[in-house]
Amino acid sequence: MKFKHVLVGTAILLMSALAQASVSKTSWGKTTDGKPVEIFTVSDADLTVRITTFGARVVSIEAPDKSGKKADVVLGYDNVAGYEKDTSTYFGSIVGRYGNRIANGTFSIDGTTYHVPLNNNGNALHGGPAGFSTKVWTGKEIHDGVEMSLVSPDGDMGFPGTLTVHVRYTVEGKSLHINYSATTTKPTVINLTNHSYFNLAGDGKGTILQDVLMIPADRYTPVNPTQIPTGESATVEGTPFDFRKPTAIGARIHDRNEQLKIGDGYDQNWVMSGGGKGLHLAATVYDPTSGRTLTVTTTQPGVQFYSGNFLDGTKTGKFGIVYAKYAGLCLETQHFPDSPNEPKFPSTLLKPGQTLHSETVFTFGVKR
């Protein structure tokens, strides 16, 4: 009987070892100022993810369709030069210090006003013109994945405090886990997210208008003409923003709705009912052509659904594909835009002695 137990235990350990994702690293060229860039490949039976130290970004995710054929389901470029030249899409990157927008690039902490350089319609977007997406991070292999680390000095893009950030990408079965942590030497504001553009048809084919989206949120945060929240939390009931039932993205995207006109499509924040209460469902996506599905869970209080409205056919990505309007969609799990200037929104203040923690999981599957 003891021998049987030993065999069972050995089998369990062997299966566990076999299930572990493989991780490899290689050089991926240099930036224009000569900084070496690396790329990591994390592979499991169902998922292969490539992540580069330039912007701590996801370069590719290979996932199977309903026939078992794998294809790349995120937009991006074949090399560092492509990402470095493109300063507007943020393909696959970690954006920060403050993902999304800060009105007029200005906020105050304890009576001191701080200014972030403006880079989007008179506002600061994704941490300013030299945010985290433009930095070369330090990468290291960890169990089932890679950890990206960055030290942002006091005053970087106008933000106070030296901020130390760690982002862990791990692959477990069909899921890509992203775990964020950060500490600061001075009170500061922080909002980290990943800016991957998903196209579940694979290899950048077609648009996402036929994709069926579900967001289990009763409310969203409307924006003004420069895409800054008005401060209101509005009901989705009776609007094109009601995705509580699975709905094709293209079904209402051209409706005569003032909010849709502002961003020429969807580019708003949805309010999650489970924010701050552990992992909760943020969204699901289904591509009827490939059968691929994407399920997003997060600990964050919001998710920005962006339908790729500003892709305009001027960028050629992987596989020689020209990225036209609606070529990909983003589901950016986050705190709300302009939270530092909206006391009613969940706080993004981080103080010395505190550690920011958040997690988002992207799980891929198929529907036959």
Predicted regions and their residues:
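Intrinsically disordered, low-complexity segments enriched in polar/charged small residues
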Residues: 9-10, 200
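Hydrophobic h-region of N-terminal signal peptides that target proteins for export
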Residues: 12-20
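An exposed, glycine/acidic-rich loop-and-rim segment of catalytic or binding clefts
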Residues: 21-368
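Bacterial N-terminal signal peptides that target proteins for export
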Residues: 1-8
